Regions:
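Catalytic-core regions of glycoside hydrolase
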Residues: 177-345
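C-terminal outer-membrane/trafficking sorting elements
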Residues: 538-581
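An active-site-proximal structural segment forming one wall of the substrate-binding cleft
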Residues: 112-133, 150-177, 198-210
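Extracellular/luminal regions of secreted and cell-surface proteins that mediate adhesion/ECM remodeling
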Residues: 373-538
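Active-site groove signature of glycoside hydrolases
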Residues: 135-145, 164-197
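N-terminal substrate-binding region of glycoside hydrolase catalytic domains
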Residues: 31-120, 145, 288-362
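Bacterial N-terminal signal peptides
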Residues: 13-26
Length: 581
């Protein structure tokens, strides 16, 4: 930065005025790092992050001979409904009524064939090639038509679980979650006399033991998940602050964070059509279940099908209700097709709540559907960026970023972060353009699964936002010498630096930040500032960091106001839902 001062004092007239303007628009020094005037607003675009959001269902019928794999997935986020009815003697596949006959065709209890498993693998490969993701459910209901009593004898369910596990284990990069169907109509664990809590728990635990921890496994209700985790008297013991819960949580360890639930009765009644109990002494009621999801489902997918309200029940299927409870349950995915009447109503209803940048006074025709669609799962916004001004002889680059997660939920799988250095200069007498572009991987300690969304707590009669989703991300990386990247001399030339966050898979699908993406298309990342390389500088170590003062100035704090909570951040203040006051 000294170079700007030298040039400033050597210039006169118009050139001096131009440089003063440039200097005023340039970043400001603070504690050895430079605060960049980057775009810090949510552009309110619907982002192409397909590991969350609205899914499209697609059925895959597996046969002993294999069947036809999914060649063209219908969406980037697919609900892959793989059904294995031909491997169950209890599943009737059709009725031949020709000539007055009524001959029923049944499946057959048998091992899953290699051909069938290959078709499942080919379908997952197609999803990967499409740069998509899938929520996977496997069941015995033919073509997902809602037939009852289709589940085979329990020993066959267990055999099929063990045979499916290797395929599922190989594809955790595209499987968002496994909805543990395997029982009942639609794979929803109802309408089947073969269903018991013990059988569902045994099958689910077998799947847990035979698949890696990256695969999140969901059951249909909180009661089933409680049984899987080892609770027997869940009406009494399934309270996250209770002694029995603490005992089981300690014994289960990380499995507590791997088991979740899917909800295909979502918001249809205050009980979600039986998902939550009405008698809290014998079942898990809504508040106990939500508190469990809030704590242990922090990185576990949650969603399903939102329904219209049943007659004479409380109406909770509104965007306004989701703008509160969605953050507690970390809701991350929903069916775009069901219930279509409810979704159509969301598209026609204006969203009249202010939630940070989602402000109906800023945006005309902000619908409830757009609010929900944009907030399912995670949504990262770069709010502040401080970076090293000069990379010296040691090649060290440092950054301090404030990234807010404004989505309902969090990342549910590991990703890789990296820095991208990009720049151009004119070289030679013909002003030929030279460019530089290279990527520097960041350590696994920079974990975006920990860039958490807001935290809302119930404290007596108060609803308090105790954390507003602003996360501090500290980066230290060795960018190395540019001599190893390009033959040109880049000393003193400002180079752009981007933060890039991508899935660790062959297609390198990257996360889109909610900031304006016009500039960020260069790198598939988010612009965090510029840096100058100068090897005459012996060290890039920042000058005396005044960390305490910076934190005091920038960190939000919670203040009570008339039985509510507001989060104050500098001169801004927000209501509990993030609306500006």
């Amino acid at each position: 930065m000294a170079r700007f001062h030298i040039r400033f004092f050597s210039l006169r007239g118009a050139a001096l005025a131009a440089l003063v303007l440039t200097f005023m628009q340039a970043p400001v020094f603070a504690a050895g790092l430079v605060k960049w005037n980057v775009d810090t607003t949510d552009a309110m675009a619907t982002l192409a992050n397909y590991d969350r959001g609205f899914y499209t269902p697609q059925v895959l019928h597996l046969k002993p001979s294999g069947g036809k794999p999914i060649g063209k997935p219908w969406a980037k986020l697919l609900h892959l409904r793989a059904e294995i009815s031909e491997f169950s003697s209890h599943a009737w596949l059709g009725i031949d009524t020709t000539g007055g006959k009524k001959d029923t065709t049944w499946g057959k209890n048998q091992d899953l064939t290699e051909d069938a498993l290959n078709v499942l693998q080919e379908s997952l490969d197609s999803i990967r090639a499409n740069r998509g993701f899938a929520v996977v459910r496997i069941c015995y209901d033919p073509w997902y038509n809602g037939r009852s009593n289709v589940t085979p004898d329990h020993e066959w369910v267990l055999k099929h679980v063990k045979q499916l596990a290797p395929v599922l284990s190989k594809n955790t990069d595209v499987i968002v979650a496994l909805e543990m169907g395997m029982h009942g109509a639609y794979g929803e664990m109802h309408s089947d006399t073969n269903i018991t809590y013990d059988r569902i728990a045994e099958a689910t635990n077998l799947m847990l033991r035979n698949t890696p921890p990256e695969l999140k496994i969901l059951t249909r209700t909180g009661n089933y998940s409680a049984k899987v985790l080892g609770f027997d008297n869940w009406g009494v013991d399934f309270h996250i602050d209770g002694e029995k819960f603490a005992e089981i949580a300690k014994a289960k360890g990380d499995t507590m964070y791997r088991v979740g639930m899917f909800n295909d009765g979502y918001l249809g009644t205050q009980y979600d059509y039986g998902t939550w109990g009405a008698d809290c002494k014998t079942s898990i009621c809504r508040e106990e279940g939500v508190a469990w999801l809030e704590k242990y489902g922090i990185n576990t997918p949650y969603g399903g099908e939102a329904l219209t309200t049943a007659e004479n029940y409380q109406v909770i299927n509104t965007p306004e209700f989701l703008s509160y409870e969605g953050f507690r349950t970390h809701t991350s995915y929903l069916n775009i097709q069901w219930n279509n009447n409810l979704i159509d109503s969301w598209k026609k209803t204006l969203f009249n709540i202010k939630d940070f940048d989602y402000d109906f006074e800023r945006v005309d025709s902000l619908t409830g559907f757009k609010y929900i669609n944009d907030h399912l799962g995670y949504r990262f916004v770069l709010r502040e960026s401080w970076v090293t001004d000069t990379v010296g002889f040691d090649g060290i680059f440092r950054a301090k970023l404030r990234i807010q997660n404004v989505g309902f939920g969090n990342l549910t799988h590991k990703v890789k972060a990296s820095l991208v250095v990009n720049g151009m200069q004119q070289v030679g007498m013909l002003d030929t353009l030279a460019s530089i572009y290279y990527e520097v991987p960041l350590p696994d300690s920079i974990d975006f699964m920990k860039v958490h969304s807001r935290k809302i707590e119930i404290k007596g009669a108060d609803t308090v936002m105790t954390f507003d989703g602003n996360n501090e991300v500290l980066i230290e990386a060795k960018l190395g010498s540019l001599k190893n990247q390009s033959p040109e001399d880049w000393t003193g030339i400002p180079l752009e630096v981007y933060l890039k966050v991508c899935n660790d898979d062959p297609v390198k699908e990257c996360i889109h930040f909610a900031n304006d993406e016009t500039r960020n298309r260069i790198s598939n990342g988010v612009f965090i500032g510029k840096v100058v390389f100068d090897e005459s500088v012996k060290s890039s170590i920042p000058r005396s960091l005044s960390t305490r003062d910076m934190q005091k100035q920038n960190a939000p704090f919670v203040q009570r106001v008339r039985h509510n909570a507001v989060v104050r951040d500098g001169e801004k203040s927000y209501r509990v839902n993030g609306a500006k006051q």
